[in-house]
């Protein structure tokens, strides 16, 4: 198969669809990989790192789309890419169709075959390609929350982890899935007083055994949340579909 990796053009997206190590595995299995010039540079992978493992470099996005049977990206295509996608071409990336009607209709119209990372599901209903993004999202949420507690950002001037003689911030995390548990781990590591709430008791038991001792668990009943929310300095909402056991 001919696989193409274009450079991401979505605003502030610096990742790349395939790393050199991934390309090496694909080439070893007999496939051909084309990388757009500087596609990996913002992730720390120069063109030379790709050519060293057997990839070929093409100068433009248009050339990559034209030659590839499958396009591997990180984020969904945006408007300038729509016209480059042809009928039957495979696209492997995060799509999140539910939040983007224009994208959904464009992919239907061009007849491409869209494989959305976020919907790849294992037999146990876990989503292996969504988990890494969720881990990043949870940790970044805590980091951003801590920033917005600062006075220059409009916050109350509270340091998440406190200092000797001053209590740490109280953090309430709603949802104990991958995003929530990573947010809790990050907040706990920064020294906050953390509570993570969920309606899945089995999940809460697991979290109480695996998260640091400054993380408490709470069954997320309406009454308990009404009592808890007014007392916290930072609340992070990471609630996913209740049918997902992850």
Label for each model-derived stretch:
Residues 15, 19, 43, 97-100, ...:
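Generic structural signal for well-ordered, non-membrane alpha-helical segments
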Residues 52-58, 73-75, 151-157, 215-221:
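Short gly/ser/thr-rich secondary-structure transition/capping motifs
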Residues 2, 8, 77-169:
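Glycine/serine-rich phosphate-binding loop and adjoining beta1-alpha1 elements at the start
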